[in-house]
Amino acid sequence: MNPQRRRRLWLVLALVLAGGLATTLVAMALQRNVAYLYTPAEVLRGEAGEHARFRLGGMVEKGSFRREAGSLEAHFRVTDGDAQLPVRYDRILPDLFREGQAVVATGRMQQGVFVAEDVLAKHDETYMPKEVADKMGSAHRKHQVAPAKVTQ
């Protein structure tokens, strides 16, 4: 093999290795920052992972909101119609946050409580993220009872 071909071969190998390394680093960075969306029922079944960072989607349960006196710390429950999960958040809540409204919170589970780092609220229940609507819809369909048959 002549020196020019050998140099080209080393250059091609170096480029392939650099491309592979760059792809690996990008994939690792993306995987670390991905937060999957789960409903309360899925979290309680253990699908989210014990120490994983994830998004929790559902509706703020009516009558569940309370705020610690003299503090920003808020406590509320998120429900998907199937299960409820307590949430703790210690920052300023969005202006659109209300009981009975759709919410998506990002955070981690700690001792049975979802500790939110970020909370997004929707202005009414007619719009919610497609993933949350689909998951809540399946929970609601699961609980519907077939109409009774009338016998004569």
Swiss-Prot record:
Residues bound to heme = 123, 127
UniProt xrefs under SUPFAM superfamilies = Heme chaperone CcmE
Keyword Transmembrane carried by entry = yes
Cite a single GO MF annotation. heme binding
Task: List residues in topological domain: Cytoplasmic.
Answer: 1-8
- Give compartment(s): Cell inner membrane
What keywords would UniProt list here?
Answer: Cell inner membrane, Cell membrane, Cytochrome c-type biogenesis, Heme, Iron, Membrane, Metal-binding, Signal-anchor, Transmembrane, Transmembrane helix
Checking Pfam families in the record gives: CcmE (PF03100)
InterPro entries linked: CcmE, CcmE-like_sf, NA-bd_OB-fold
Periplasmic domain ranges by topology: 30-152
Q: Does the entry feature the keyword Coiled coil, yes or no?
A: no
The terms describing its cellular component in GO are: plasma membrane
**Membrane topology, from the record:** Single-pass type II membrane protein
Task: Give GO BP annotations, semicolon-separated.
Answer: cytochrome complex assembly
Indicate the transmembrane segments per the record.
9-29
What NCBIfam families does the annotation carry?
A: PRK13254.1-1, PRK13254.1-2, PRK13254.1-3, PRK13254.1-5
The family note in this entry says: Belongs to the CcmE/CycJ family.
Q: What does the UniProt function comment say about this protein?
A: Heme chaperone required for the biogenesis of c-type cytochromes. Transiently binds heme delivered by CcmC and transfers the heme to apo-cytochromes in a process facilitated by CcmF and CcmH.
The name on file for this protein is Cytochrome c-type biogenesis protein CcmE 2
The scientific name of the source species is Xanthomonas campestris pv. campestris (strain ATCC 33913 / DSM 3586 / NCPPB 528 / LMG 568 / P 25)
